[in-house]
Amino acid sequence: MENKTASDYNDLPLKAPKLKGILLILFLVLLDQGTKYFAIRYLRGTSGITLIDSVLNLRYLENRGMAFGLLQNKILFLVLICIVFFMAIIYLFIKTPATFYYRPLLYTAAIVFAGAMGNFIDRVFRGYVVDFIYFSLIDFPTFNVADIYVTCGITVMVFLMFFRYKEENDFDFLKPGNRSAR
């Protein structure tokens, strides 16, 4: 019986990881849009819903900018930023080797893409992003489910780059002409 090393497992091909990533994106975007539909239907025009007194509230907000209220009413600029961001994530998704080693990167990229897509849909079809989750305990800016995807996804990507993909050649696959780093 042959002993397998960690490197052997890292090089194992994944079964349809990009299809799974696309399905994950679709599911997460639908979940985000469903929660925004709830916010529009049940929170707009009300004072909101208190889930945990003095801690967590649901309240309707139309955000015409980006995170923390930056770039208010600059929709064309925000749409262009999103398109560039989508192109970068798609490039990463296409070029990343479909191996066990890169599975966390592929799925994290899908989560970030889903969050950006959820807010992009709002900007294009509504002219604003629907936000509705408010932590009153710390007076944190109101946000939505897509924001959670982007924030958590980027955080995980940073950790991956510092702790998993720290070898010099781990991202060689992104260089022009290279097919795979491993």
Label the model's feature ranges.
Residues 1-182:
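Alpha-helical transmembrane bundles and membrane-interface segments of multipass inner-membrane proteins
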